[in-house]
Amino acid sequence: MSKEHGAAAEKHEFRTEVRKLLHIITHSLYTNREIFLRELVSNASDALDKLRFAQTRGEAAPAADLDLNIAITVNEETRTLTVSDTGIGMTRQELIDNLGTIASSGSERFLKELAEKGEQASNIIGRFGVGFYAVFMVADSVTVTTRSALDASGAWRWTSDGLGSFELEEALDAPERGTRIDIRLKEDAGDFLKKDHLKDVIRRHSNFIPFPVSVEGEHVNTTPALWREPRFQVTEEQYKDFYTFLTFDTQAPMDTIHLSIDAPVQFTSLAFIPNFGNELFGYDRDKYGLDLYVRRVLISKEYKALIPEYLSFLKGVVDTEDLPLNISRETLQENALIAKIRQTLVKQVLAHLAKLAESDAEKYATFWRTHGRVFRMGYNDYINRDKFIPLLRFNSSALDDEKGLCSLDDYIGRAREGQKTVWYVSAPNREAARLNPHVEIFRRKGIEVLYLYEAADEFIMESLGKWNEFEFRSAEHADADALKDFDDVEKKDAPEALDEEGRKTLSSLLSHMKTLLGDKVEDVRESARLSDSPACLASKDGGMTASMEKLMRVMNKDESVPRKVLEINPDHPLTRNLLRLYRADADDRLLAQATEQLYESALLLEGYLRDPHALVGRVNSLLEQATGWYAEVRKL
């Protein structure tokens, strides 16, 4: 670092607020000291931008053949780190104004909070961008040598140890154009003399600066800021390479969302939908967000405030010109611009997914199967409700297999004439849903039922209320009277209808079964919904469904079995056999066993059976009796 200069150096005192700030910075142990390099590179980039703008206006600039670049070099012998640029440079007065006073509101806020809250300085520095002064976290002394591209009055050197004053003098060894910052590093800042460490810092914080940044002659920021490029100029291969750079995932992304927004807020964004969900490989569900850049400089990695949790599968970046570079994380949370970016981003992503669902249903189905568990949680985004609901997907009785998906609008489009209800049933899989006794009446009536496989789906249905004049109801709450206007489309051979005497016996049998079961059930009554099953448990209309009750019991650690209505299918062969048995001997032990078995089988299907041992023992006893009778009849 040369000391050549012209006239004697002028000594200037820092203003009071700067002295306070420098004292805090130089005496604080702050772990994230590398931000000083981000600040210096950002300043250098701004200087290059200003020069380029001046050149486009035709303003004279010395050394016109100089490339626009930023160079970082080290001298291990003198423990000096140098950051230089070929930008617009500074005049004498600009040196005083820019480096002698606090120009950033971030620094002012920093001092104010330190005074008001009395926190440790090391706890606060990281929350505020203190601009150029951050260099004193690592520097014993700093020398800034600069030549303005717009002023022929010469070059100047600014020198300070950060202790309260700075010196200003003419410089005879200044660059042809631009600024050189020589930093004499503290003893504990030796990492910043290592080339690999410097490269890592640049790539993490300043990788997308629009000008070449070199470390010891090696070009470091080689990845272009693709989000700044027009979409039609970016190839799929470039998108894939950038996605890999961002996520380390070698697969191509499932989909790409490239946005350039001018209103109501200006920002650009490049977001990707991965081919795997957050749950895969044990990803931390709480670790999500898009990287926030301000003028290509990284401000916050994986910043959660930019997207709601139901879009947490997105990977990518957001870049805006409208935030100051020195904005802090704390200030970001209170910034109205961030809220506007988030609102706009959510609307754009939902619009993109809507177009995808319409143009490529199979690709959207793949998206749903991969990310639906997280994405479906957007049902509580009431601001975007009308955009979100059409994107929901479910399996259904009208589809061929478990992989099939349909929207609510698809369901409504297939509804029977006069139908104004979307019916659904919760189950762990398609086979369980298909065999659910509550679905039998809908199959008989030719009414489609949505199959819900996720616990959150019932919350979604209950929160929706209505959609396109259709209400949402569980098949468990189906009222046979409400479905009586729909003719049966599935005819089955039924036994001869019970005569008047038979119906009296049935009524008496049901009362007897209620007596046998006692307080275990609310009632035992004839069912109008069952076609194939002998019995089922039913809830009162408006009550919780079985799956919701189970969920609430788990949450409340409640192991009690709720009292339900046991419905009996009067046309089932088992019921007709019980009628014959009841007529012959109401006190027959087999009748009591069969009643208990029907009840516990229904409990088992609904997921309420706590202890299967009694059921298994009873089944074995009944099998023993049945096989004995069978052997006797066959004379074996």
From Swiss-Prot:
InterPro entries: HATPase_C_sf, Heat_shock_protein_90_CS, HSP90_C, Hsp90_fam, Hsp90_N, Ribosomal_Su5_D2-typ_SF. The keyword Cytoplasm applies. It is found in: Cytoplasm. Residues 551-636 are annotated as: C. GO terms for molecular function: ATP binding; ATP hydrolysis activity; ATP-dependent protein folding chaperone; unfolded protein binding. It holds the Pfam family HATPase_c_3. The keyword Cytoplasm applies. Residues 1-329 are annotated as: A. CDD domains: HATPase_Hsp90-like. Its main location: cytoplasm. Keywords: ATP-binding, Chaperone, Cytoplasm, Nucleotide-binding, Stress response. Residues 330-550 are annotated as: B. It comes from the Bacteria. PANTHER family: HEAT SHOCK PROTEIN 90 FAMILY MEMBER. Molecular chaperone. Has ATPase activity. Belongs to the heat shock protein 90 family. Homodimer. This is Chaperone protein HtpG. It comes from Oleidesulfovibrio alaskensis (strain ATCC BAA-1058 / DSM 17464 / G20) (Desulfovibrio alaskensis).
